[in-house]
């Protein structure tokens, strides 16, 4: 259970723009990380993506032109997560943090361009047995008195000692292949243009190597959105998705989608490795 309730205010500050947040994140210094540091909750007001912004997102990722994909809710939630982690009391540097899990659940249809309020709270987990530190950010979005979606992300903030058990070879899941896509070398920049996430590790080789990667990798939520677009063509509109990011996907790679029709689970495979494990809930009727 989260220990910090969302702040309730009659009015809330506007949600900062993504480029400004990313610039501040480059210089964010960590505070002292105790066993259970208390990080203030945040509340921001923002507007849902308008029809034009959604059209660009949908065209890139394969959704219907007028769709409001559940994955698009992450675009606002990510900004709320970043703004919350920029608190001086957040104990970790943002550079080097790794997005390891995400879940999004839609409670009601989001109206394009409608005013939303985002409330975000933080849980910093105790160190694992290997010394790793994780944090969880939970954002809930409301349209007046109506809750419209919740988005929860888990991040690896500090890597621990190498765990031999977790380093064992991955078993490939016994699911049929039902689709896939070829990533272009410009897809990281294309997704940045529609999402606002200009993290350098997704853009070009020199920038990625500057941050310790051999090659640029695609945004994890780009992979999730591409998978959802293919799954929706088979099972109807998705209203919830939960994923675990297992390995990075380099730009220029081929991604395979494994999924058995009529089941919730899916897997993305790249280069013989499991990249994403997930489950999806489709709208009833």
Question: Residue spans of the language-model regions?
Answer:
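A broad, structure-centric signal for solvent-exposed, well-ordered loop/edge residues
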Residues: 53, 111-113, 190, 208, ...
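A conserved acidic, glycine/proline-rich C-terminal tail/linker
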Residues: 227-257
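Hot-dog-fold acyl-thioester-processing enzymes
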Residues: 1-99, 164-234
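Short, glycine- and charge-enriched coil/turn segments that flank and shape catalytic ligand pockets
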Residues: 63-64, 143-146, 236
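HotDog/MaoC-like acyl-thioester-processing domains
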Residues: 1-36, 80-82, 97-183, 251, ...
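Hydrophobic residues on conserved beta-strands that form the core of alpha/beta folds
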Residues: 41, 136, 150, 238-240
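Short, surface-exposed secondary-structure edge patches
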Residues: 107, 214, 246-247
């Amino acid at each position: 259970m989260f220990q910090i309730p969302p702040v309730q205010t009659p009015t809330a500050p506007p949600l900062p723009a993504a480029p400004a947040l990313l610039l501040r994140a480059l210089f964010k210094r960590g505070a002292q990380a105790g066993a259970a540091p208390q990080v203030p909750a945040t509340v921001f007001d923002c507007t849902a993506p308008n029809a034009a912004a959604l059209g660009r997102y949908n065209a890139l990722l394969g959704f219907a032109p007028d769709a409001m994909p559940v994955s698009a809710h992450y675009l606002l939630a990510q900004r709320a997560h970043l703004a919350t982690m920029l608190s001086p009391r957040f104990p970790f540097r943002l550079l080097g943090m790794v997005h390891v899990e995400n879940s999004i659940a839609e409670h009601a249809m989001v109206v394009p361009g409608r005013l939303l309020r985002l409330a975000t709270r933080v849980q910093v987990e105790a160190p694992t047995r290997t010394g790793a530190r994780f944090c969880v950010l939970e954002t809930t979005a409301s349209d007046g008195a109506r809750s419209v979606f919740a988005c929860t992300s888990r991040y690896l903030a500090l890597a621990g000692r190498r765990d031999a058990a977790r380093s064992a070879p991955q078993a490939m899941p016994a699911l049929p292949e039902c689709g896939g896509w070829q990533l272009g070398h410009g897809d990281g920049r294309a997704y940045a243009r529609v999402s606002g996430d200009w993290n350098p590790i997704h853009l070009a080789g020199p920038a990625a190597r500057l941050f310790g990667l051999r090659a640029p990798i695609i945004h994890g939520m780009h992979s999730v959105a591409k998978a959802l677009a293919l799954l929706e063509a088979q099972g109807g509109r998705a209203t919830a998705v939960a994923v675990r990011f297992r390995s990075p996907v380099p730009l220029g790679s081929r991604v395979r989608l494994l999924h058995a029709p009529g089941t919730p689970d899916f897997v993305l495979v790249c280069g013989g490795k499991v990249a994403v494990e997930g489950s999806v809930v489709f709208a009833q009727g």
